[in-house]
């Protein structure tokens, strides 16, 4: 998913050009597609699909979930893929593509780590957050709270009580898991409605469906953390420094990144992180193996 920095997105997609990967891109509706110059992309192995249906993305809003689900559906309809990896346009791979492909091909593993919502986070689902109201959103959230208008901090599905789970937005799920998520939402549309006015539902809706499934919960990398575990330790795929906000990574983080054993790092930015990405590319170059014909 991309909303800024077309130059960085170009570098990311061309770095991921590999016989085992295809790329599906959603560009924020607020952005001008012409700035991205997709017609100039010259991929040798990966198929590139740019979604025509676009959502106006707002931070913390359900629109991020809608865009993610649109990408899932597009990929499900386009081919028989084994793994669905969600990335932002400001991510960058740490390992060579062949190593990434090997790691992500592990069977019966869901690359996601999460936990039941902690008490200090109950507000994320109990309160109503009206992100589309712009500068007035806080007023309405406080008004609803003062009037005692709140949601339950759990959701009922097929007469079962589901706890709400948290997990960072970026993960890599199996085709079976993605199909389960889409089927569940189709059969139970009230789930999407429940999270519509939540706080950052992109970190709640998909984890809640996944971790309330006994089959997929045991396939996750982690389904529980000690209370107050830092966000940085909850990312399944990414090296990230969220202190106090997401750091734009530079070359001084190189050794931390390369020793992290994560698959990707974020955030990177063209003109700021170029030396870091060059260093990663150089470290990986000798390990890259010539690729063969495209495989779905």
Predicted stretch roles:
Residues 1-296:
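ER/Golgi luminal nucleotide-sugar-dependent glycosyltransferases, focusing on the catalytic module
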């Amino acid at each position: 998913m991309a909303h800024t920095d077309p130059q960085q997105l170009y570098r990311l997609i061309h770095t991921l050009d590999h016989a085992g990967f295809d790329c599906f891109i959603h560009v924020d509706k607020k952005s001008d597609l012409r700035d991205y110059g997709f017609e100039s992309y010259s991929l040798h192995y990966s198929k590139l699909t740019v979604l025509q249906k676009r959502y106006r993305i707002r931070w913390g809003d359900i629109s991020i979930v809608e865009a993610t689900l649109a990408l899932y559906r597009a990929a499900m309809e386009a081919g028989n893929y084994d793994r669905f990896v969600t990335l932002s346009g400001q991510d960058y791979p740490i390992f060579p593509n062949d190593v990434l492909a090997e790691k992500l091909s592990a069977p019966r593993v869901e690359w996601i780590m999460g936990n039941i919502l902690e008490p200090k986070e109950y507000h994320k689902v109990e309160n109503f957050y009206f992100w589309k109201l712009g500068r007035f959103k806080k007023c309405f959230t406080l008004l609803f709270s003062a009037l005692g208008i709140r949601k339950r901090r759990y959701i009922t599905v097929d007469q079962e009580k589901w706890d709400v789970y948290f997990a960072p937005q970026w993960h890599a799920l199996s085709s079976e898991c993605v199909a389960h998520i889409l089927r569940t939402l189709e059969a139970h549309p009230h789930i999407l409605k429940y999270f519509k006015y939540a706080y950052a539902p992109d970190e709640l809706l998909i984890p809640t469906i996944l971790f309330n499934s006994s089959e997929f919960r045991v396939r996750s990398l982690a389904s529980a953390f000690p209370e107050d575990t830092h966000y940085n330790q909850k990312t399944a795929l990414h090296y990230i420094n969220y202190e106090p906000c997401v750091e734009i990574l530079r070359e001084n983080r190189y050794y931390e990144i390369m020793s992290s054993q994560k698959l990707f790092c974020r955030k990177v930015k063209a003109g700021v992180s170029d030396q870091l990405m060059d260093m990663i590319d150089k470290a990986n170059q000798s390990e890259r193996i010539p690729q063969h014909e495209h495989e779905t």
